[in-house]
Every structure is written in structure tokens, then in C-alpha cells.
Amino acid sequence: MIIDEAHNVMDAITSIHSITISLSQLKRSRAQLGVYLQKFRNRLKGKNRVYVTQVVRLLDSLAAYLQNKEANTKQGECIVKTADLLVGKGVDQINLYKLMHYLEESKLARKVEGYIIDAEEREKKEVSVGLRQPDGKKTEPSVPVLTHVQGFLATLTDPAPEGRFFFERSEDDKDVRLKYRLLDPTHHFQEIVEDARAVILAGGTMSPVSLYSKLRFSCYGTHHDRQMSDYVNRLFSYLPSERLTTLSCGHVIPAGNLVAWPVMKGPSGIEYDFTFDQRKSSTMVDELGIGLLSMCHVIPDGVVVFFPSYAYLDQVVQRWQMRTGTSKCIWDRLGEKKAVFRESKENASVEDTLQQYSSAIDKGKGGLLLSVVGGKMSEGINFSDRLGRAVIVVGLPYPNIHSSEWKAKIEHVEKSTADRGGSPSESKAAGRDLYENSCMRAVNQSIGRAIRHQNDYASILLLDRRYDTERIKRKLPGWIRQGLVQDAARQPFTEMVGSLTAFFRAKEAT
């Protein structure tokens, strides 16, 4: 079995075995089930009617929990005990295993959703031909949610030891949700591995270096052998090391086709520190904008900039668009250098944005594309040749370590490491690596959007003081590490700009 794009395999397995349900979905499914029960109550056999009533009770219990949590807690999220979700009237008497068996065998969700859709279509036809008068109320078509709810109920029946339930508020604070998250993909992937004669994980960006690898793989002895240990520790921890082989290849381009800088300071000498506490500084954001102006002046064609999040990108753009007196704002000045485009979190067409960006480059204006790590532009889109003469990464996109979900993930990894015989320090290192590798895998994936063939060339600019630390450098792909400018921390911003100027002049002359 060969799995391509395997940098996604852990997240894919986790996502498949995770599920989220909102209070609004619970209410909608409860209402749909109520309509169905009222219509067919007399046709349902006694046993079926009992099971349907049990589903109603279970939905009421989950909805009541969310409503109580919404009213009595200010927390954005927290871990939830399974028992707390099953305290509704009569719920303790429900055999969840029998109920789930009934739902699967009877296909109740499909029947309810089919009836609701059919009833709505029939009502529309009656109104259109004048058989009944519209009631004046604007009703939205029912969304088939009971099948989704059934999936959540299945996790209540048999939650995995490595899974957790969470309560969370929606981003707009208009809804509350229950989440079930798989924290560790090992056991689910093991089922796949044991059915195969051999398994190959292949990918272009699979190498955040795990310092924790020494716990299990010191026998490998070479740096490249340890590069993929993050995957090994989380997918093959049950296998002896002699059954595992790793191979890390270099890039197809010659060394002279890449210049990579960890950029520590901006043009004014202000240190680039895009940690969560510091990155909101107006001075820092202005320094970033002025730095981009200088870079865009010497980098030809297309420049792609990746920000840690949509929220931070919005904040930066808002600051750059502020005007002081009659002087031009940073946003306008950037627009004079290159046509500026930005990725939107909304369902705006990626194709349209890319087409406009490409067109601006073809016309000689050049393009500056502001994107987000982990967003629509960071994977599956190739910025080859003129589309990506520079990739700039602003800061490090660490996930929120204070979130209940990440606390649970780290705690689980630390405990699993200890259970396998790891020392307390090794357990802590495993949790830290999980957190750092999640960040660096996203960074490496974004960097990999440029330089797509042997004759391609580009610059990689990593804007943050932390990119000069050995821990972070070792989590970059080998071909990037080899291209990093030495002693970059000691070099002024002007030296970096001069290096870029010389690099692109040399390439354009060949």
C-alpha cells in the first residue's frame, strides 16, 4: 500500500474519527424527529416507537447540557465527561448499544430526512398551484442533520480511550457545540497497516525533525533517519524499529537556485517577534510593512506572503490601510510596487484570485499575494517560476496551546510516552515535539509551494527571531537548511536586501 501526500495522513485519520455537533443541529434534528413521530406514531410498532422515543430523550439530554453550559459558563471551550452528557430524564435507562443497532438497521435517519424533504416539496407545490395559501412566514428548507447526529451518538456509545469530548462556543458566539476529537491516530492506522504486506508513506514535506526521536531511534544513527520520527512515533509506535525504514531525499534544484534567510530584524532594526503577545504591536506591524516594501522593490514578479492566521492578516491589513495626514499609507505604497491580492476566509473563488494574480505578473506589474498558513493557498497550489520568486513566512503558526483540545493532545502524548518506558524528561519532550511539529509541518508545506522543478529558483524569507534557533532550524527540510544564509542573525536588513538583489540579477542574466 502506498499513501501519497502522507504529510496529511495523521490529520486525515484524526478528522475521519472526529465529529462536531451544534445546539442548532440538535434542535433541528429533534424537531424533524418530532414531526416524523407525530405523523407515523400510529403506524410504528411498539418496539420501534420505544426506540424513537429514546432517541428523542437522548437529543433532549444533549441539548439541555449545551443550553445549561451556554448560560452558566463563560469558557470558550472545556473538556466534557461522557457521563455529564447522559443525565437527562430516563437517559440512564437507555441501552446505547441496542439503540445504535436499531438506528443502523432501521435506517431511521434516512427515513426521517426523506419524509421531511418530501413534505417540504409537497407544500411548495400546493402553494404554487393555489391549493393552499402561504402563511407569510419565511421558512428555510430543512437540512438533513439526523444522519450527522447519529454519527455523534455512535461516539457516545463507544468512545475510544484516546478520544475526548469538548464543549466550545462558535467563533461568532451565536452557537455552542459538542466536539469529539481523536487525539491519537495510532490504533486506527494499525488496522490498515496489519492488512497490508508493506506500507509506504510518501510526501514532499514530511520532515519536521523530532528531537524526541532519540527515545526510540538512536539506533538509526544518522540525521536523515530521524527526520520522520514524528510519523513513526504516532503511527508505528507499536512496531520494532528494525521493521521501519526511512529515506529523505534532497531537492532537484542546484544549491545556487535558492537563497534562504531567517530575517531577525526589520529595516529600522526592530526585532521581528511575532509571538502572540508581541505581534499586535503597531510598531511591529509597521516594521513588517516597511520591510515588505524593501523586499518587493528587489524581488521580481510574484511574492507570496504567509501569515499565521486569517485574524492576524485582517489586523495587519487594517493597520496598513490607516492614513496619517496626507502621506500615503503602507497599503497604497505596496500597491505601487506590485498588485496586491489577499486570501479571504470566506468562500471567495481561489481560482479568480490566482487568475488576477497571474495576470498582473504577466503584464509586468508583479504581484503580492497575502495568504494564510493552512489556508486555501498553502497546499495543492504551485507557485512555480514567476508566480513565486519569493515565499515569505511571517511568524510561526503555533496552535493555541491554551486550548482544551491541545492540552488534551499533549497530555495524551506525554502519558503514552511514559507508558512505553520513557522518562519524565522524554515524556515532556514528546509533548513539546508534537506541538512544534504541528507548527513546522504547516510552515514547510507553505514553503514548498515555490520551486517546483529543476530549473526553478526563488528566495525563502522567514520573518521571526525564532527562525534562528537550532530547534526550529532542525525542523526545516534539509534542502532549506542547506540554503540558509549563515550568521543571518548578525546581518542587518540591508545585507539581506543586497543579497536578494545580487541573487535575482544573477538569475536574470543567465
Residue ranges and their predicted role:
Residues 1-333, 467:
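Conserved coupling segment at the C-terminus of the helicase ATP-binding
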Residues 4, 381-388, 474-483:
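Surface-exposed flexible segments
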Residues 291, 372, 486-489:
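The structured alpha-helical core of multi-pass membrane proteins
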Residues 264-283, 339-468:
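Conserved RecA-like P-loop NTPase helicase motor core
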Residues 73, 304, 311-312, 447, ...:
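Long, largely alpha-helical accessory region at the distal end of helicase-like NTP-driven motors
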